[in-house]
């Protein structure tokens, strides 16, 4: 089980909406529809808006820069239109000179709503996105820790099985040492299998060298007991081979190969 498997991370990259006047024009249309349906515009959710447009994937500096650029662009566009159509602009402006003008009242309300939106956006940029980044970081650290814990548990399980099987094989080998005539082929097979189990157990214990848990300490003691019993059996068999080398050639070769690789 690997929570950070590369195959699971092979996802399509999200595409953020382009920050443009058309994007905000669409939101304005939604405001109009909301007012028509009797929905309070104050309930506008800035977080949902930014997430729907995938803006939370943008760096904060880029988001602020793009919004500032759009604001400057709109001001410049308005100035250019005023210069090119000054007379029309004067006529347009006269419609807002009356303090009781309904259009002016709606414009002021829109300005107030826009200010609320910008305040919420500023709060999101300064606080919420920063908090989200911290949460993501914590989650990744948590998943990494779970991987480490799972790997440790898997090693513990493998070590327990190896030591348990090793104890049974070591007991059988020790009993075989007292049988006459000596079953050379069986003893050689037991020695080879025991050596593999002891080597694997030692490697797992080395990977847990930094652990001081009581359970690991117990497994280390079991490993030492198994190793000592194995060494006693090897000593007995070595003495038998030295006493009668001609009749125990295969067993002698097995013992020599173990000594060379140890």
Swiss-Prot record:
Q: Name one GO cellular component term.
A: Golgi transport complex
Keyword Cell division listed: no
Please report the record's description of how this protein sits within the membrane.
Peripheral membrane protein
Q: Where in the cell is it found?
A: Golgi apparatus membrane
Enumerate the Gene3D superfamilies for this protein. 1.20.58.1240
Q: Which GO terms describe its biological process?
A: cytoplasm to vacuole targeting by the Cvt pathway; endoplasmic reticulum to Golgi vesicle-mediated transport; intra-Golgi vesicle-mediated transport; macroautophagy; pexophagy; retrograde transport, vesicle recycling within Golgi
Major localisation: Golgi
Keywords for this protein: Golgi apparatus, Membrane, Protein transport, Transport
InterPro entries for the chain: COG2_C, COG_su2_N
Pfam families, A to Z: COG2_N (PF06148), COG2p_C (PF22431)
**According to its UniProt entry, what is the function of this protein?**
Acts as a component of the peripheral membrane COG complex that is involved in intra-Golgi protein trafficking. COG is located at the cis-Golgi, and regulates tethering of retrograde intra-Golgi vesicles and possibly a number of other membrane trafficking events. COG2 is required for ER to Golgi vesicle docking. Not essential for viability.
Its quaternary organisation is:
Component of the conserved oligomeric Golgi (COG or Sec34/Sec35) complex which consists of eight different proteins COG1-COG8. The COG complex interacts with the Rab GTPase YPT1, the Glogi SNAREs GOS1, SEC22, SED5, VTI1 and YKT6 and the COPI coatomer subunit gamma SEC21.
Tell me what else is known: Present with 3270 molecules/cell in log phase SD medium.
Protein name as catalogued: Conserved oligomeric Golgi complex subunit 2
């Amino acid at each position: 089980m690997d929570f950070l498997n590369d195959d699971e991370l092979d996802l399509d990259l999200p595409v953020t909406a382009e920050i443009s006047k058309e994007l905000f024009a669409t939101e304005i249309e939604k405001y109009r529809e909301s007012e028509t349906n009797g929905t309070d515009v104050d309930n506008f959710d800035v977080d949902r808006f930014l997430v729907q447009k995938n803006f939370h994937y943008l760096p904060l500096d880029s988001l602020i820069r793009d919004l500032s650029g759009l604001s400057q662009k709109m001001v410049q566009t308005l100035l250019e239109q005023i210069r090119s159509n000054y007379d029309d602009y004067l006529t347009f402006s006269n419609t807002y000179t009356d303090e009781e003008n309904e259009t002016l009242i709606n414009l002021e309300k829109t300005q107030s709503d826009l200010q609320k939106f910008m305040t919420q956006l500023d709060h999101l940029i300064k606080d919420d996105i920063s908090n989200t980044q911290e949460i993501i970081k914590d989650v990744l650290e948590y998943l990494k820790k779970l991987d480490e814990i799972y790997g440790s548990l898997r090693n513990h399980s493998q070590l327990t099985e190896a030591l348990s099987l090793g104890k049974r094989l070591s007991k059988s080998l020790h009993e075989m040492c007292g049988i006459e005539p000596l079953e050379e082929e069986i003893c050689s097979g037991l020695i080879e299998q025991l050596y593999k189990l002891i080597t694997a157990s030692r490697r797992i214990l080395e990977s847990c060298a930094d652990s001081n848990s009581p359970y690991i300490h117990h497994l280390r003691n079991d490993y030492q007991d198994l190793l000592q019993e194995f060494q006693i059996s090897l000593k007995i068999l070595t003495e038998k081979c030295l006493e009668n080398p001609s009749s125990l050639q295969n067993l002698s070769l097995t013992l020599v190969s173990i000594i060379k690789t140890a």
